[in-house]
Amino acid sequence: MSNLSIFKIGVGPSSSHTLGPMLAGNLFCKKVAKKLDEIDRVEVTLYGSLSLTGKGHLSDKAVIWGLNGLEAKNLSTAIQDEVNKNAIENAQIDFCGEKKLCFNYEKDLIFSKDFLPLHENGMKIKAYDCKGGLVDEETYYSVGGGFVLTAAQLEKKGKNSNQNKKKKLDIELNNAKEALELCDKRDWDLAELSYRYELQFHTKEEIRAYCLEIWEVMQEVYYNGTHPNEDYLPGKLHLKRRAKGLKERVAMTADPMGIIDFISLYAIAIAEENASGAKVVTAPTNGACAVIPAVMLYLKNHTIGFSDERAIEFLLTAMLIGSFYKKNASISGAEAGCQAEIGSASSMAAAAMATVLGANAFKACNAAEMAMEHHLGLTCDPVAGLVQIPCIERNAFGAIKAISAARMAMTRKSTPMVSLDEVIETMYETGKDMNYKYKETSLGGLATNLKTVC
């Protein structure tokens, strides 16, 4: 399976809790496309983390967007508002974009605190006829990064169920060990390896165009974050946006440590856009969407030679590293804590930065390992169920750690003790051992100890 989908253009604030439920709604529409005449009502039940932090993450709204047949890439805030109003105030949805149905937001959208057995982010969608008979149903799991699997897919093949191999590939990459062996054999860096891998699924023109579109949108999101229409982020925290003021201050500073402020600016601006529900790039999740572009903006604005070609190499490297986390661990905060989101993004960015600065595959993987090693155990405890505190600032720290890890790996003379595959395995084990209160449920940590909210 191609790794390009590690980066997706969508809307905030969460890939697993916003994009995932929206995609589930889209998938259900496709499932019942030939039964529309029979359907009179739909009912959605959100479970586990989707329920516990669903309203703050807009999960309830997102599934409604999906059931209206809307897709994330082209979803504007104006369309969001129109569909929300129609569903909540007018009690109606345009099911699959083709049939108007009555929809009672209070009764047809159910928040259950129960957890479904296969994953922390579960949901069920049911369709009924005019007599109350069940027409169709499906159970979906939002497994992180905007990826969604049905219960049958998850039971059959676990996290790799969406990676059916239709043909024998010349290059198969399941972990960092295999990648390093191939790079050593062919004298490739990680960017070249990732490019050769993607050529098995796409033309060189398609790969280039996709990466440049992702990079263009990342820069657009940063600009929007420094030119906001509102001074405060949505939600009951009434959190003031900081990026605009931070940009004005760092532009005037002569502080030799000012580079840290620039990196923070890039990350905060993008993370604030995500928190507002605006367009962002999932990288590899929405909660961690600012880490990778912040490092790229640092390279573009503060180093020499970061061209479009280097940006493509950066993204190719990052998506390769991200695929190892997705295949062998998790990129879901609800499954493995924030280490799976910010940690994975920082690891991806570290390897990518090292690669575009000339590191071989071994040093790039060492950079990725160090970045994750120092995110191990990081909890996901969003205050008020919003992707704001501590999420926005964590993106800045993830970017700074990535840059530090890349530089440390490139100047290192000794042989690393820990491999990338070992730290990926450790992250996943740590996440599965972590108490559910600290995995995107807002039932522990800062989410309960911040007294001004609780």
Model feature map: region roles:
Residues 7-27, 276-295, 338-346:
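Conserved phosphate/anionic-ligand binding catalytic regions in large, soluble enzymes, centered on
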Residues 16-33, 293-305, 350-358:
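Alpha-helical support elements that line or immediately flank enzyme active sites
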Residues 41-54, 85-93, 316-327, 369-382, ...:
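Short, mixed-charge aromatic SLiMs
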Residues 52-61, 297, 327-328, 337-344, ...:
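Short glycine/threonine-rich loop-to-helix capping motif typified by GTGT followed
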Residues 69-252:
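C-terminal regulatory domains involved in ligand/effector binding and gene-expression control
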Residues 201-337, 445-454:
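Accessory "access/gating" subregions that flank catalytic or transport cores
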Residues 306, 317, 323-396, 408-417:
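Hydrophobic alpha-helical bundle architecture
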Residues 417-454:
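Extended hydrophobic packing segments that form well-structured cores
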